[in-house]
Amino acid sequence: MRCRRLCAFDAARGPRRLMRVGLALILVGHVNLLLGAVLHGTVLRHVANPRGAVTPEYTTANVISVGSGLLSVSLGLVALLASRNLFRPRLHWALLALALVNLLLSAACSLGLLLAVSLTVANGGRRLIADCHPGLLDPLVPLDQGSGHADCPFDPTKIYDTALALWIPSVFMSAAEAALSGYCCVAALTLRGVGPCRKDGLQEQLEELTELEFPKRKWQENVQLLDQTREIRTSQKSWV
């Protein structure tokens, strides 16, 4: 029963759902990529330095977030192509490979961002500005005090709020990327007839639906041609 719920790709609504998932991946990927870029521009570029004052979890989480956004956009494009070309095995395998990689990367991104948020909340953002304020590693020293405060090129009281305001949406975006990538994996496995999502007669059903849709598309094209011809004739008469 659980397997049936997970393997939700069918011949009737599966291609349209795959197309919507592809569009959603492109949108979510762009948003996550934008959040990662804004985070780097507003927070990490101030506190990152060669001396390693910024702990690796912050930089790693941000890099993975940007990479996950780029890969999600690529996966969305492949999903759109696969939804319109249901009988091309190469697209199915490409969809499966990209979906698996993006699923793992998005899951790692979510965990990394959760770790970054947890550490930042636990120490009150002091590790973000440890190089500018060496004395602030002591939790008894307020953020707006301590040695080096006058030499900081940024406002230390805003770095904490800005980082959290950008990290928390990134966590949800990464979780959404992982969920959508999981659906793409299911769709690719179903189309290839591999694993527990295999459905007998799916290819035949898709072929029948394609054959039924082809005359309808042809009829719509003919109607459009007739409308265009009428418009041309009307314009010619009005010109005469």
UniProtKB/Swiss-Prot annotation:
Keyword Transmembrane set for record: yes
Protein name: Keratinocyte-associated protein 3
Membrane topology: Multi-pass membrane protein
Keywords: Membrane, Transmembrane, Transmembrane helix
Keyword Transmembrane helix: yes
GO cellular component: membrane
Signal peptide: none
Entry superkingdom: Eukaryota
